[in-house]
Amino acid sequence: MAALITSNFTMPQEYAAGVFKKAQSTSALAQLSGAMPQKFGKTNVMVLTSAPKAEIVAEGGEKSPTPTAYANKTISPIKLQVTARVSNEVMWADEDYQMGILSDVGENCGIALGRALDIVGIHKANPLTGAVAASVTEGLCDATDKAQLAGTKFDEAIEAASGLVIANGYTPTGIACDPALSFGLATMRDTTGRRIYPELGYGQGVASFEGMTAAVSDTVSGKELTKASDIIGLVGQFDAFRWGVQREIAMHTIEFGDPDGLGDLQRLNQVAIRAEIVYGIGILDLKAFAKVVKAAA
């Protein structure tokens, strides 16, 4: 196979009108835990597991040891790519129409890479296949603490999950909600029929709840997964989830070769558009998180 020949592709600052795109949610984890600068490759992070304690020392008295323990946690690189093909006819269209289509493809590649952070970080899955990836060894789905929804008592489930996080010595700073959880919470009513949380609207743009930062995305339940998840929410101290961009490979067009196994581009009169990113992902302590899971069937 001939070597791929690529050329840079610069997206415009504003996307051309006339292209309809179904709205897609972005990464909840990115909203709740800020990215940290990282170098490429596996990185070890020292995590304090036993804090030192101060001691009163009498005049002339001896000082006792104050043990402190640390553990190593690994931040692992995860490479992700999105490749989309378009026909040469699209490339030959007039400039306004062409840039509208390509900008739309580019934006959706970015959305896919954003969603991938959640699918990998929460569910340990390959976003393309929906199956658990053997290369991903840890995800927030592995948290053992969980609160199960009872009927429609969404707020009580969140409260219970928050209590589990607090009992483990952490502070619940954020909540990642599936739209089913945020909508259920937003439409709860008291005994008189009045909405309990009218400020939440219909739960699609929730930014905070009970002092916690909130993010809503269907990546929390993982609609891409081949095996359905029962997770509808994650409560936790989200600085215990570490992520960053180790390498961001600019979007580019590929005009020659077979970059995705679907056939030679020149033979099929097509051009491929590719975007790639390398995330570094790690969880310092799963005890900093508690899941909110669906009610029993």
Model-derived regions, located:
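Short loop/turn segments at secondary-structure transitions that flank enzyme active sites
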Residues: A51-K53, Q81, V90, R115, ...
